[in-house]
Amino acid sequence: MTAKYRELDVWTAGMDLVEHCYQLTTSLPRDEQFGMTSQVRRAAVSIPANIAEGSCRKSDPVFRNHISIALGSHAELETYLEIAKR
């Protein structure tokens, strides 16, 4: 049985984003391994994870809450990437 969240384009895009972020963080300085690298990866992983968790819930309000959390994680990730760019 395949989980329905795997059929969501937004989940697939989130998984692609995680892969990209993992590749990107390998180029960060070693002294950022437990700082920026960890934060970027955690924020990225949170996006598809919350989409998957929310889609498996049986309540639309709970699903919307998880989507809201995923959006927050996306904003967090954007901020970390902007900081890393500077």
State where each predicted segment sits:
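Amphipathic alpha-helical assembly/interaction segments
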Residues: 1-86
